[in-house]
Curated annotation (Swiss-Prot):
Pathway: Phospholipid metabolism; phosphatidylethanolamine biosynthesis; phosphatidylethanolamine from CDP-diacylglycerol: step 2/2
Site positions for Cleavage (non-hydrolytic): G253, S254
EC number: 4.1.1.65
Record-listed Pyruvic acid (Ser) modification sites: S254
Post-translational modification: Is synthesized initially as an inactive proenzyme. Formation of the active enzyme involves a self-maturation process in which the active site pyruvoyl group is generated from an internal serine residue via an autocatalytic post-translational modification. Two non-identical subunits are generated from the proenzyme in this reaction, and the pyruvate is formed at the N-terminus of the alpha chain, which is derived from the carboxyl end of the proenzyme.
Membrane topology type: Peripheral membrane protein
Gene from which the chain derives: psd
Cofactor note: Binds 1 pyruvoyl group covalently per subunit.
Taxonomic source organism: Pectobacterium atrosepticum (strain SCRI 1043 / ATCC BAA-672) (Erwinia carotovora subsp. atroseptica)
Name this protein carries in UniProt: Phosphatidylserine decarboxylase proenzyme
Active site: D90, H147, S254
Length: 341
């Protein structure tokens, strides 16, 4: 009964106005009141402030400063192995697996199409058909900066307007096409593993979605799809990000979806539905074929292998305040079909 009421409220409440109000309040400098709100939030959600670069809640001028707090250097070591991709965010792995018949799993008995998620961009959808997907939900207590699973060169960013349903297990089980209906920012990268999409999904009271190259992408919410293209590697103005480097952040909430092209990638064997994720830990890797042992002639002297490279620390770059990369080309809905219902 209570769950039914919560779902009905998702349809009835003025979600955009609630989100604007939350964003306004989260950016206000209110001195002791701000500290009180942060302290209550920390207590309610059991936030581990010992991981934060600034563990003292009095050091944050606004709630948003606290919400996107950076972590202490080295607190999230990045797996250094070249054949591995790393988890892009702290959270919970709500769903992951193969993209089958162009569909992704949202929850038990619920799926949605790749084209709907990508706002009808059939050319981009073709890049990931028969590939892999993973959905990570960031809870209120989590670190809310997003990082790169591997080295990548940004080629395209698309802002897709949409609804602002809350994103959690209850709504995933009850709101059809949830991730394809909500506001989102699609980031497409060239990587050594093939095309990679990292999709930042908005939700109720997510005041803004930001990237390190463009600053605030939303708001404003103008109700139209926007598309930016970027130079390829080696060209002037190319946006090149390293494995583990920050690429974006949420103020507040929500969910990140990764799409991987069909190929030799497989998810790390230890992952399961509802696994806790930590930025920098193993996420996926190149499938290793069994190899025939190499037999050396008798008397051959072999040098010892070099010591394993220690994990490298993740990096966080400040988000630009002045908007989009001047090198980016802004255009219309090239390659798009109308939004799927």
């Amino acid at each position: 009964m209570l769950d039914n009421i919560k779902i009905k409220l998702q349809y009835w409440l003025p979600k955009i106005w609630l989100t604007r109000l939350a964003g306004w309040g989260a950016n206000k400098r209110a001195g002791k009141l701000t500290k009180l709100v942060i302290d209550l939030f920390v207590r309610q959600y059991h936030v581990n402030m010992q991981e934060a670069l600034q563990p003292d809640t009095a050091s944050y001028r606004t709630f948003n400063e606290f919400f996107v707090r950076p972590l202490r250097p080295g607190i999230r070591p990045v797996d250094p192995h070249a054949h591995r991709l790393v988890q892009p965010a702290d959270g919970v792995l709500s769903q992951f697996g193969p993209i089958t018949d162009g569909k992704l799993i949202q929850a038990k008995n619920h799926d949605y199409t790749l084209e709907a998620l990508l706002a009808g961009n059939y050319m981009m959808a073709d890049l990931f058909r028969d590939g892999l997907f993973a959905t990570i939900y960031l809870s209120p207590r989590d670190y809310h900066r997003l990082h790169m699973p591997c080295d990548g060169v940004l080629r395209e960013m698309i802002y897709v307007p949409g609804d602002l349903f809350s994103v959690n297990l209850l709504t995933a089980d009850n709101v059809p096409n949830l991730f394809a209906r909500n506001e989102r920012v699609i980031c497409l990268f060239d990587t050594e593993f093939g095309p990679l999409a990292q999709i930042l999904v908005g939700a109720t009271i997510v005041g803004s979605i930001e990237t390190v190259w463009a600053g605030v992408v939303t708001p404003p919410r103008e109700g139209i799809i926007k598309r930016w293209t970027y130079p390829q590697a080696g060209e002037e103005g190319a946006v090149v990000l390293a494995k583990g480097e920050e690429m974006g952040r949420f103020k507040l909430g929500s969910t990140v979806i990764n799409l991987f092209t069909a190929g030799d990638l497989q998810f790390a064997a230890h992952l399961n539905i509802m696994s806790v994720t930590r930025m920098g830990e193993p996420f996926a890797e190149v499938r290793q074929d069994e190899q025939t042992p190499v037999v050396f002639p008798e008397g051959t002297e072999l040098e010892e292998n070099d010591a394993a490279q220690p994990p490298v620390a993740a990096t966080s770059e400040p988000v630009q305040a002045d908007g989009q990369n001047p090198a980016a080309e802004v255009s219309g809905q090239t390659g798009h079909k109308p939004d799927a219902p």
